[in-house]
Amino acid sequence: MATLETGDLTIPDEILDPWLGKIKYGSAVATLSNSIPMKFGKGHSITFDIGEAEHVGEGANKSGSTVTPKTVTTAPQKFQKTVRWTQEVKWADEDHQLDVVRQILDLIQPALSRALDFGVFHGINPATGTAVTAMGTSLSDTTNSVEVGDADKPYTNLDAADVLVLADGYNPKDVALDPSFASVFGGLRNATSEQKLYPDLTYQTSPAGRLENHNSSVSNTVGAVGVGSFVSNVKAFVGDFGTIRWGIQRSLGLEMIEYGDPDGGGDLKRNNQIAFRAEVVYGWGFADLDAVAKIVDAVPAV
């Protein structure tokens, strides 16, 4: 029989690998953009703008090319989630222990997935809702902003955001929506047939849906309502999410803790409990904040 010991748990690959793949199912950022391989620690990636090709006439000299580099800095950001379980799991047989591990991973995964969004979108600690200085810039710092008007149709706001992103030379192919804004689109129907105008819009985070020729993802991480210690007023982020450089810098581990008070919930021994903790270290950076526009409702209709 397998014995759970204090410290890192050895999780079979057939359990851990699919779980790692689920990270994107709770994150709008991961749904709309691909991760890139990262080493642990601060890193830099460089993108280049080399301009257009030159026509060379017969017998003419070739001109030099101007290369404009942009450096994207990524820094490690650690998130953890701790859950408590009854102490009896230690005495169970191997099959039951693995079943418990699966349940624990299922509980932890959504929180760690959403943590990526809260960091990228707002630069906050999701446990407290407060800004994390070390995270620096967030997507909500973009100066491309569209204000929702009282009588606006939602697609006019989306169009206006597209215009801002296009003007900065990027393709506005992605949109992450707060559920309250997504439901406005979802409620629109053809006046004659009563068919939905956007049947491909889904209210889930992943896999991506489609909205007005954008890849779409819906999550309350967009507005951070109920999580942020502030009112963001953000209803959507629109733009090229491929300009977000993100990745997992450290493999996830599951640690079993038998002693002490690891989460402020009281002494484990006294409560006949053990705790399980998983950690993930993300890294992210932005090639250009102008690649994204935000739609905000700073003065909601009364």
Tell where the protein language model's regions lie, with residue ranges.
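Extended, compositionally biased alpha-helical segments that mediate assembly or anchoring
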Residues: F241-T243, Q249-L252, M256-V302
